[in-house]
From Swiss-Prot:
The lineage of its organism: Eukaryota, Metazoa, Chordata, Craniata, Vertebrata. Expressed by the venom gland. Belongs to the venom metalloproteinase (M12B) family. P-II subfamily. P-IIa sub-subfamily. Residues 1-71 form the Disintegrin domain. A motif (Cell attachment site) lies at residues 51-53. This is Disintegrin halysin. It comes from Gloydius blomhoffii (Mamushi). Monomer. The keyword Secreted applies.
Length: 71
């Protein structure tokens, strides 16, 4: 929702302050295929394994989402 940096529905999330819906100090992310222990995973880390004729998808190092490869 507007103004929220993370999903504050789970008070047990170590990356997100459940009272403010903001990332805790030092956290880059709270969830996502490219988020590990509140930090973005390194660029080039496989986040989605290829299926069929598709290719693997990789983290970009600057977001928690797993961008789809353009091929």
């Amino acid at each position: 929702e507007a103004g929220e940096e993370c999903d504050c529905g789970s008070p047990g999330n170590p990356c997100c302050d459940a009272a403010t819906c903001k990332l805790r100090q030092g956290a880059q992310c709270a969830e996502g295929l490219c988020c590990d222990q509140c930090r973005f995973m390194k660029k080039g880390t496989v986040c989605r394994i290829a299926r069929g004729d598709d290719m693997d998808d990789y983290c970009n190092g600057i977001s928690a989402g797993c961008p789809r490869n353009p091929f």
